[in-house]
Amino acid sequence: DHAEELARLAVNETGMGVYEHKVAKNRNKSKGVYYNLRGKKSMGIIDMDEKTGLIEIAKPIGVVAGITPMTNPIVTPVSKIIFALKTKNAIIIAPHPQSKRCSALAVNLIKDVVAPFGVPADLIQVIDEPSIDKTKELMEACDVVVATGGMPMVKSAYSSGKPSFGVGAGN
């Protein structure tokens, strides 16, 4: 459990948030995402409508660009990684430059946790020195963009030429 360490680093690095609130969020939100997805089908036939004959099939998309904000630098990347792994996709996290250290630590801790389960080391990546240009390049190179942030970031995701999902104030 690295909730306290990550909370302290996030508050110190970003200058945002209350330490105790960050600890609680780090502990509770990530677990909530996991428990919400546990046992749910995310591959193959996930629904069949006998009446209409329609079959819903889920498959991996490829590489996900996970754009994360400085306001939630731990739980947002962790959640995006959980979603990507559940759907058998690779993910590259592009943290906000003002939260790069704490976000990178969170990503690397997740990599350490999943490695014993056979998850390839490069399936989860993080941009260590993020910038607007690197994030834009990532969005153009990936298969889908999942962006959390303000209006300029979400607009950039929607303008990337890739399928994009925007969440946050810019949505």
Located regions from the model:
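N-terminal Rossmann-like NAD(P)+-binding subdomain of aldehyde/semialdehyde dehydrogenases
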Residues: 1-55
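Alpha-helical elements of the RecA-like P-loop NTPase motor core of helicases
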Residues: 8, 75, 104, 136, ...
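Redox-cofactor binding/interface segments in oxidoreductases and associated redox assembly factors
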Residues: 19, 66-69, 146-147
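Conserved small-residue-rich beta-alpha loop and adjacent elements
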Residues: 42-113, 161-162
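Conserved NAD(P)+-binding/catalytic subdomain of aldehyde/semialdehyde dehydrogenases
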Residues: 63, 126-171
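Flexible, glycine/proline-enriched loop segments at strand-loop-helix junctions
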Residues: 68, 92-101, 122-125, 141-144, ...
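A glycine-rich helix N-cap at a beta->alpha junction
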Residues: 112-126
